[in-house]
Amino acid sequence: MTVLDALIRVQREMDGSIGFRCSCRVGMCGTCAVQVNRIPRLMCSTLVKTLDAEVVTVEPLPHYPVIKDVAVSLAPFFAQWRRAQAAFRPKHADAPTLAIIGKDSRFRQLAATKRDCITCGACYAACSITGMNVRYLGPAAINKALLRVLDPRDAARADRLKTLDQSSDGVWRCHTQFNCTAVCPRKIDLTDSIVRVKRALLRPGKALTV
Amino acid sequence: MTSSVGAVLKKYRWQFSGMVAWTLQRVTGILLLLYLLLHVHTISKLSQGPAAFDAAIATFSSPFFKCLEIGLLGVVVLHAFNGIRITLVDLGIGVGKQRQLFWTITVGMGLLVFLAGAIPILLFAVLKVR
């Protein structure tokens, strides 16, 4: 039984008024992230028996406004997502053929480990910096920006780097605590992404490669 | 609270070592700052002549202060080796293996150096073994 199953049972059999969010139930939509026993994780991918605890505590994710019970608004998360310009901006929008990224290219290989973000918001909740500074980009937005910045087809590299380089709310706020990496349900090494962005910013002369 | 901390550590098998290391670095940093103040205070006795300085140093050769010195060594070693870990991470070395980095460098190598210094201090300065 997953924590989500347990909560659904509670809702059906004990208290129909409790509020939580879920959708796919298989860990691919990122809707049901909450704090289970003080760690941000997906309810649908957390088996109660693996928690190895007498009492299972389900709380709303920290650093987000609560809508109802354990359902939170991801508005702060997506505000940063937009600020990092997560959307792809093509260099050649009118190109007659598709740009090809070879499967052996270094960008393609790095992207394979970084592109699985399901925007569940767990990393943003686990990060202690986002808790102190609402303007900080947060791990997911930085990871997304890194993917765009390294993409040879992307046209907005300079804009994105400028946002990432902001001293008070860009990558430099990261203290490499690795909490984001520890909680990511997709096992994305988010701290690694942030370190890569920092190093790229420190060596502007060097071509941005992987 | 304690049970939830225990559950966190159990479940994640110290995946949060990055947070532990960060906290250690802050705490040891503040302790080193306090030590620095004491150190400057003692050194400033030199301006009052050799006798005043010798008196200050004599205070610190008591077994109690020698024990504190072992603690100081531990704080310095933790801060230094964790600093090396942070530098490596910032250089992009071993970021994907941060837990192993914490256990081998900060804890492992730190412990070796700490014991190499702490045992002689304990034997010869505190217990006065000859």
Where are these regions (language model features)?
Chain A
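Active-site phosphate-binding and catalytic loops of NTP-dependent enzymes
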Residues: D15-R21
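Short beta-strand scaffold segments in enzyme catalytic cores
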Residues: A33-V34, C127
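Short strand-turn-strand beta-turns centered on an Asx-Gly dipeptide
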Residues: Q35-I39
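Structured interaction patches on ligand/partner-binding surfaces of diverse proteins
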Residues: P40-D52
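Hydrophobic, ordered structural segments
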Residues: L42, E54-T57, K68
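Aromatic- and Lys/Arg-enriched surface recognition patch
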Residues: V48, V55-P60
